[in-house]
Every structure is written in structure tokens, then in C-alpha cells.
Amino acid sequence: EPFAGSAAITIHAAYHGLANHFVIGDTLRPLVELHETIIEKPATISDAYERIWSAQPEGAKAIDYFLKIREQYNRERDSERLLFLILRCVANAVRFAKNGNFSQSPDKRRRGTHPDRIRESVFAVSKLLKGKTEFCCADFATVSESASHDDLVYMDPPYQGTTDGADKRYFEQLDRERLIIRLREMTTRGVPYILSYDGQHGEKKYGEDLPADLHAYKMLVRVGRSTQGTLNGKEVITYESIYLSHGLRAPKEEPQFSFALM
């Protein structure tokens, strides 16, 4: 999973016994280190989160506390504060600036996930993935270059709408042509992949389709209400474009389901 993010697909695959070895990769080092700490040292990260969460003051001062933790993280780049920021930011809509700084604001309506629940989730993930996972802080091309025909590469890169437009929400943007070149190389090597790339919000479509010569199967999957739309006070249904590499069996019926990550 070279654009790991929350590593939800890795966790899903491990939970359902779909693979016995995993690679979690991302260009944002603190995020990769957070995954590694969760999996390899679940007690350490759980204790740290509980300490940071419990130190929150009540009322309006909680906002200042969040901003203080965010400032400390942006200076230290530590996984403990990063976990708190992810779970405490508005609508869990995680945003990083181009320089790697955490840039999202605090959610004023809640205090973040309770430490007991986080501890339970962290230990469950550790049990699934400990001893089975490699961690790689590198570009997606580097992470995926060792994949073979016996592997499955799942990619959820920044969408064209957040790379080419004015709305830059991610630490590292992605050049579409570089992605297509890598997909062609993977197709030539017989490496199967699933790509979540662009889609549409309501009636508005984002991004161009992949080139026809890739012979990838495209389907639209309903993933629920748009987080960005919710932040803007609008209810907009989001559909993601999912591409299956040539050779992967497409479902008989295109799935229509909703899911939530962390």
C-alpha cells in the first residue's frame, strides 16, 4: 500500500486473511513511523495518546491546547502527537501542508476518541500485523518496484483535483504522467493493482480517465457524503473511481457501498 494513509486496506486484508505479508509505505515519515509504532509497540503509543488526550482542558481552552500540540508536532514530527491530531481534528479530515506541517483545525464539538477505545483498536491492529509488515518511507514508485505477480498493490493517491487545482491538501502531490508510467510498468511485469483515483461529487466529475491502453476496468463506488462538502455545510454524495488492472476479475455487479476510515 504505497499511499498508505490510514492503511485501512492493509488492515482489512489482514482481518479477512487475504494475505500473510504486507508493505505499508508513504512519503510522510511521521505517518509511517506512527503505523510502525502502532503495530510493533502498541502499549507505547496507547499510553502516549492517553497522556496527551487526558491533559486537555475543558471548554474554549481545549482549542488552544490543540494548537499547542499541533505546533509541537510541526516542530518535532513525533508519532504520538500526530495520532492525537488525527483523531482530534475537524471531521477527521487530515490535512498536511507541502512542508509536512499538520494544517487542519480542531473539531470544536468533541474531544477526540476516548483512550480506552484507541487502546483496544491499536492492540487489535498490532495482533493482526505484527511480524508480517514492512514499513517504507519512500516514493510510491520505490515502494511498489519490488512487487511481483504474486502481490496486490493498492493505491489511493492524491486526486487530480487536489494536485492540479488550487486546493492543495496533501504533503506530496502526484504527477499524473508519472503514475501512468508506473501503471504501464506494473502491467508489463504482470503486477496486479487496484487504484482509487478521482471520481465525482454529486454531478461534478474530477479528473480524466486512465488511458485505454492500460486495459483497466473502471467502476464507480459510492463512498457516502463528501467530507469537504460537510465542512462547507453541504450534503454531497461522493463516488470514487476504482480501477482494476488487466487480469483482475471484475465483480458481476458494480458494488454500491459506504465505508468509513478510522
Regions found by a protein language model. Give the residues of each.
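A structural motif corresponding to the C-terminal end of an alpha-helix
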Residues: 121-134, 182-193
